[in-house]
């Protein structure tokens, strides 16, 4: 699975013409979000709002952390491109779409694969999942921007 996401990262990096600094920023963004994901999973599990069928062993959590880094990095290369093209308005749209479609995706996955994930009934678990997707975009993009710099400062800005 990590190999597939690594290939996806390479393809997105090529298609977005990402520099080494941007790729590094995307990986740092993924690393920050990996910690957020692990913390949120633990909190949702403790509240009884969500159960993910994972083993809470350190080795498995380390693998999940590495997977989330490689899985999120292409997303931040894309959000960087959106910010470059559409500015903060484009990022707000991406965040809103993620906040709506993220819970839809997770509810679909819970209905289709109940052995992998179960979500408690009610509004608050869905709101928490939406907030998690929003936090993933905001935290990851902010971390990437701290490493790679603002998208408007890109030397390829006018070369689309």
Task: Go through the PLM ranges and name each one.
Residues 1-160:
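Aromatic-rich, lipid-facing transmembrane alpha helices and their immediate juxtamembrane interface loops
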């Amino acid at each position: 699975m990590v190999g597939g996401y690594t290939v996806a990262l390479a393809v997105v990096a090529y298609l977005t013409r990402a520099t080494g600094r941007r790729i590094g920023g995307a990986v740092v963004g993924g690393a920050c979000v990996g910690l957020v994901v692990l913390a949120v999973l633990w909190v949702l599990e403790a509240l009884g709002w969500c159960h993910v069928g994972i083993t809470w062993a350190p080795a498995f959590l380390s693998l999940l952390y590495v997977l989330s880094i490689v899985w999120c990095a292409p997303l931040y290369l894309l959000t960087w491109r959106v910010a470059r093209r559409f500015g903060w308005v484009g990022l707000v749209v991406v965040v809103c779409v993620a906040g709506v479609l993220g819970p839809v995706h997770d509810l679909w996955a819970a209905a289709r694969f109940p052995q992998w994930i179960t979500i408690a009934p009610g509004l608050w678990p869905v709101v928490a999942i939406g907030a998690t997707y929003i936090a993933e975009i905001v935290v990851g993009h902010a971390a990437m921007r701290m490493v790679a710099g603002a998208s408007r400062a890109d030397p390829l800005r006018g070369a689309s």
